[in-house]
């Protein structure tokens, strides 16, 4: 079943049926002010932190309520509806709507009772408040009086848990008042006589506002109970039914902002207003609301500026291939998904309620990879930040606080860190993600000076980027298991594998092998011969260990338990085949050609499904070892034989590195949201963003996806497609082009900005090959192979590649 379509000309997804199988959401804002909005205007807002900066309330894991609601009421007939289908929920035979999710904005259009409305939700660039710009048009042949009411439900405390759970406290600290064109909410209002800089138990007055611009306020309400009324809900609030609000504030209940204006519309006439929401002191709120009196002009300009900003970032890499699904994901939605995970990590969505008050180390370092080719200047700032969250022993802080203070942080070795973050120990893989991320940034930009930039460690000391990477090697070397391979510690990438200080992870061993390959390149550049020799010797030892211990006839095992038990050997009754060791044996370069092809074939034969490759098989049930925490999940779910979507990016890349274009693209299309637009009732998640996992073949809901938007899938699939399928593989001194594509792709184009040059790349495939370069021309000059040295680049570089 289909609920909408992609409009690539505007880079929008257009929802034509509002009764989607789940809330389909979009992200608005920036790291300073974030907002999540669904196709029915549900969602919430927060300043900086979804945990400690919550502004608008949202109730998770129930109906998609409350939200950013605008009610319209015909003053003559007293009939009312909402500018989004919900919350009023008029009969869809008479109520028509569209929702356009774009890049950092959402538009909702509705037609009912010969009234057309269009509301545009966005956060202006470089601002920390949101705008609901509403246009109402009278499409009838008679004069109409339309009562318009905007409703925003405030949290009673900026902390999500305090607002939702600690009601004996949070309900008695807020009040609301009316200030001419806005409702002002004050948290801890009774502290308004404190001197500047003073607090009581770390508490001060916090101001929020809900304002109206472009029309006068005819009535208002600052109390949720007063607006909704007893035994009423968001679908039939008393304030809307009556056509007038009670003009009363909140004192010791639940605060809200509700503002009503009555618009008189002649036939064909349109009027615009704007509602504004934010966390600002009252004097600043007054200035903001007054700025939007000419809301039509300013809102148009702000929205256009926002579109140009995001489309500008996306324009740095665009493709035109025979696959529309591939094009829309790479050009727009996978790219935008990468930016959202880059900004919000796993801090705030409809699944992540905001309790993770910081950046996960491994998550964030991987997320950076997805935007390096689009916004290297943004990427390097986050790389610096994450390097400064590396402990001086080489490990990463499992959770990096939003208030991170480099050089002064506690670590998992300190009880205070464990108590504050809930993370009791280091993870084996965290710092190893730095190697490909730093390498990709330097290779994309050619900024080799970055390797010598000095950055502090999280707790104490400082060092160059090169030194940070060496410390990461030290961390792995200092945490080896019984056989001499890297220990799994509290977790490797798979949080459901608790291997401890003696158990060993093949996945981490392959990561470590790859890390040493990368660091050898940096050591060569630095002419650090002594350290280069150390890496060569260490890598050879590790390679022998992996080959001797981990290759099991036709697959790489997953590792060893603390008791030395093998995980993932052919004879195991459960979990005898694992996805990630096979893909990473290829990505790391450790597997020989025969092993690589045999391992990948086994993945395809034993793990692949129509929705992607499952993480392992068979699922755990009766034979899980003590550290196999995946057994807590239902079969076919998450780490217990679910289709863990992040791993799809790695299998795409692995197949592409082997030149298997058909197989690489097949893995992409199986798990691509856009390719499931016509099966929305099965997938349920948005058809324009990735989810964390899809239920596997052992689930009765095979194909249903979960945990939208904020997932490492966005970056791994982007890397798998850009570096793998499209073959864009820069290094320190230029760009290698090595596509691995479906045979039927006779021609495709890539537009890529690279080191100050705009590359227009045309790939021709008359022989229907999957991979291989016959000849490469750069500005008409034939290269000796498929590599473009940097000195061959011009301001506009025309590239023509023939596959063979």
Give, region by region, the residue ranges found by the protein language model.
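Anionic coordination/interaction segments
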Residues: 1-362, 376-385, 389, 440-444, ...
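Carbohydrate-active enzyme catalytic cores, enriched for enzymes
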Residues: 2-17, 22-23, 541-544, 548-612, ...
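Hydrophobic, small-residue-rich alpha-helical packing segments that form membrane-like cores
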Residues: 104-106, 499-514
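Catalytic cores of carbohydrate-active enzymes
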Residues: 151, 165-166, 397-398, 513-630, ...
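Extended, well-ordered alpha-helical scaffold segments
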Residues: 287-295, 301, 305, 329, ...
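Carbohydrate-binding/catalytic loop surfaces
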Residues: 349-358, 398-427, 458-464, 483-505, ...
């Amino acid at each position: 079943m289909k609920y909408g379509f992609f409009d690539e000309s505007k880079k929008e997804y257009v929802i034509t049926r509002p009764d989607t199988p789940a809330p389909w959401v979009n992200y608005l804002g920036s790291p300073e002010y974030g907002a999540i909005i669904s196709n029915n205007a549900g969602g919430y807002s927060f300043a900086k932190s979804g945990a400690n900066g919550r502004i608008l309330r949202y109730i998770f894991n129930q109906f998609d309520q409350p939200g950013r609601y605008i009610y319209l009421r015909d003053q003559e007939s007293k009939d009312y509806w909402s500018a989004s289908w919900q919350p009023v929920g008029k009969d869809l035979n008479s109520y028509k709507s569209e929702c356009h999710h774009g890049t950092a904005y959402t538009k909702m259009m509705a037609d009912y009772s010969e009234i057309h409305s269009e509301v545009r939700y966005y956060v202006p660039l470089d601002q920390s408040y949101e705008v609901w710009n509403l246009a109402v048009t009278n499409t009838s042949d008679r004069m109409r009086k339309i009562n318009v009411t905007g409703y925003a439900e405030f949290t009673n405390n900026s902390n999500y848990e305090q607002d939702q759970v600690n009601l004996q406290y949070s309900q008695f600290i807020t009040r609301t008042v009316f200030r001419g064109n806005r409702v002002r909410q004050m948290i801890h209002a009774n502290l308004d006589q404190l001197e500047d800089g003073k607090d009581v138990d770390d508490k001060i007055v916090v101001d929020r506002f809900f304002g109206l611009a472009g029309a006068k306020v005819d009535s208002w309400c600052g109390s949720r109970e007063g607006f909704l009324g007893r035994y009423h809900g968001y679908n039939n609030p008393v304030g809307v039914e009556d056509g007038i609000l009670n003009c009363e504030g909140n004192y010791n209940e639940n605060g809200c902002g509700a503002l009503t204006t009555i618009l008189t519309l002649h036939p064909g006439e349109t009027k615009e207003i704007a509602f504004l929401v934010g966390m600002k002191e009252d004097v600043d709120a007054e200035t903001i609301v007054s700025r939007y009196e000419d809301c039509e002009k300013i809102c148009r300009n702000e929205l256009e500026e926002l579109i140009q900003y995001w489309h500008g970032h996306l324009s740095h890499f665009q493709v035109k291939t025979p696959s529309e699904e591939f094009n829309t994901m790479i050009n727009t939605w996978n790219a935008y998904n990468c930016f959202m995970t880059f900004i919000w990590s796993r801090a705030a969505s409809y699944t992540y309620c905001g309790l993770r008050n910081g950046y996960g180390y491994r998550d964030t370092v991987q997320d950076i990879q997805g935007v390096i080719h689009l916004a290297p200047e943004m990427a390097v700032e986050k790389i610096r930040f994450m390097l400064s969250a590396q402990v001086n022993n080489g490990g990463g802080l499992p959770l990096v606080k939003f208030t991170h203070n480099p050089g002064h942080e506690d670590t998992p070795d300190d009880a205070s860190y464990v108590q504050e973050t809930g993370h009791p120990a280091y993870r084996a893989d965290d710092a190893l993600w730095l190697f490909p991320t730093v390498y990709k940034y330097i290779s994309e930009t050619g900024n080799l000076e970055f390797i010598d930039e000095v950055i502090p460690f999280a707790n104490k000391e400082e060092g160059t980027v090169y030194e940070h990477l060496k410390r990461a090697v030290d961390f792995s070397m200092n945490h080896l298991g019984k056989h001499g391979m890297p220990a799994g510690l509290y977790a490797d990438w798979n949080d459901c594998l608790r291997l401890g200080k003696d158990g060993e992870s093949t996945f981490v061993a392959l990561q470590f092998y790859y890390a040493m390959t990368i660091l050898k390149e940096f050591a060569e550049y630095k002419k650090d011969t002594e350290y280069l020799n150390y890496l060569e010797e260490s890598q050879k030892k590790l390679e022998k260990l992996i080959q001797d211990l981990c290759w099991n006839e036709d697959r790489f095992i997953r590792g060893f338990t603390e008791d030395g038990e093998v995980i993932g050997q052919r004879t195991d009754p459960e979990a005898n085949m694992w996805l990630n060791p096979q893909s990473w044996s290829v990505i790391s370069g450790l597997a020989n050609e025969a092993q690589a092809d045999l391992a990948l074939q086994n993945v395809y034969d034993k793990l692949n499904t129509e929705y992607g490759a499952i993480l392992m098989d068979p699922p755990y049930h009766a034979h899980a070892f003590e550290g196999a925490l995946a057994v807590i999940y239902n079969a076919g779910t998450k780490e217990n034989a679910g289709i863990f979507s992040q791993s799809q990016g790695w299998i795409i890349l692995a197949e592409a590195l082997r030149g298997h274009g058909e197989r690489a693209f097949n893995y992409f299309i199986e798990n691509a949201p856009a390719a499931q637009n016509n099966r929305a009732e099965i997938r349920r998640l948005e058809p324009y963003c990735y989810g964390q996992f899809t239920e596997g073949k052992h689930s009765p809901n095979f194909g249903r996806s979960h945990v939208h938007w904020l997932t490492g899938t966005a970056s791994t699939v982007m890397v798998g497609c850009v570096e793998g399928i499209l073959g864009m593989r820069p290094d320190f001194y230029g760009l290698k082009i090595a596509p691995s594509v479906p045979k039927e792709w006779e021609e495709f184009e890539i537009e890529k900005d690279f080191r100050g040059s705009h590359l227009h790349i045309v790939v021709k495939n008359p022989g229907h090959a999957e991979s291989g370069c016959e000849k490469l021309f750069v500005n008409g000059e034939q290269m000796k192979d498929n590599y473009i040295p940097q000195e061959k680049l011009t301001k506009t570089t025309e590239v023509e590649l023939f596959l063979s």
